[in-house]
């Protein structure tokens, strides 16, 4: 399945015990496996309708995946693993999220996800700003949302990779994100070289998802992503939410934006408070049996 080109192998793991990190490595391999941006597991939950687990191609387990949860929703709804009207409550590593499937001709074609509130405090992301340095390096008047204490923010913070400096602003959507707004087209940046170096900077104790963004209007953004544990992907749902949260925080966008990534367009809404709402497409590509 894929959501805006972010592709996953989804499996019902309610009655299975496997070495899932190793399974993820084998299945995700695009040359010797099925090929994907990771695997997603359906698991039972004591606190929600169902539980979602997600493993990256390197075997690491991620807290959440915005495009993945749409794939997950299509899987559990169409296979009647969860049978209910309206929104589903899904347990994830980032908390319990509410997902509303949007059905067309009897199939889940899109999904709307309440992704939770963005967090900007350095310790919540986490970002380990070196002693003696300030994480917040902007004029406070640049902030459109003043409820966030500037002494807890990492905003406009310069990082240098391969002799090039990016000014990043960081946020958590249950997983860590660093966002850099660029004047030059994002398509021309050698993200395959820069991305892994940013991911593994000592600044990020749990590594980071790195996004480069062009602002094309108050309601229109374009971005590319290097995902922690996965590399360059065609889209990143939590990343799209973090991008809009950061842009809205800095007064660069309106409440709702169309965010274009190489795999498609996501609609992201955040008015400066409450949960970020993400809506986007989901498609099943094929079904098969993995024999290891």
Language model regions located:
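N-terminal, positively charged, Ser/Thr/Ala/Gly-biased leader segments
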Residues: 1-16, 113, 129-131, 137-171
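A glycine-rich beta-to-alpha transition motif near the start of alpha/beta enzyme domains, typified by
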Residues: 1-108, 178-292
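Hydrophobic alpha-helical segments and helix pairs
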Residues: 83, 87-143
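Proline-rich low-complexity regions
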Residues: 116-118, 126-128, 176, 205, ...
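Short clusters of hydrophobic/aromatic residues that line enzyme substrate/ligand-binding pockets
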Residues: 125-127, 159, 198, 290
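Selected transmembrane alpha-helices and immediately adjacent juxtamembrane segments
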Residues: 168, 176-179
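Active-site donor-nucleotide binding/catalytic segment of nucleotide-sugar enzymes
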Residues: 171-173, 278
């Amino acid at each position: 399945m894929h959501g805006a080109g972010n592709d996953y192998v989804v499996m019902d793991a309610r009655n299975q015990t496997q070495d899932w990190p190793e399974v993820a490595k084998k299945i995700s391999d695009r040359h010797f496996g099925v090929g994907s941006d990771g695997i997603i597991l359906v698991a039972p939950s004591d606190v929600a309708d169902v539980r979602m687990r997600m493993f990256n191609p390197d075997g690491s387990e991620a807290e959440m995946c915005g495009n993945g949860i749409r794939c997950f929703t299509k899987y559990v709804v169409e296979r009647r693993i969860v049978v209910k009207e309206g929104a589903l409550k899904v347990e994830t590593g980032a908390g319990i999220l509410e997902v509303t499937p949007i059905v067309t001709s009897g199939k889940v074609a899109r999904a709307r996800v309440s992704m939770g509130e963005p967090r900007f405090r350095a310790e919540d992301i986490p970002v380990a700003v070196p002693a003696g340095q300030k994480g917040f390096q902007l004029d406070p008047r640049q902030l459109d949302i003043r409820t966030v204490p500037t002494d807890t923010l990492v905003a406009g913070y310069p990082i240098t990779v391969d002799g090039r400096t990016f000014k990043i602003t960081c946020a958590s959507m249950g997983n860590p994100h660093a966002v850099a707004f660029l004047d030059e087209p994002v398509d021309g940046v050698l993200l395959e070289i820069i991305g892994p170096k940013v991911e593994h900077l000592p600044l990020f104790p749990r590594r980071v998802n790195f996004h480069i963004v062009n602002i094309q209007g108050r309601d229109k953004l374009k971005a590319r992503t290097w995902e922690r544990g996965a590399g360059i992907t065609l889209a990143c749902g939590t990343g799209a939410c973090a991008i809009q949260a950061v842009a809205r925080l800095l007064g660069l966008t309106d409440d709702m934006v169309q965010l274009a990534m190489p795999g498609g367009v996501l609609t992201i809404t955040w008015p400066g408070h409450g949960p970020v709402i993400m809506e986007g497409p989901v498609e099943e590509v094929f079904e098969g049996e993995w024999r290891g």
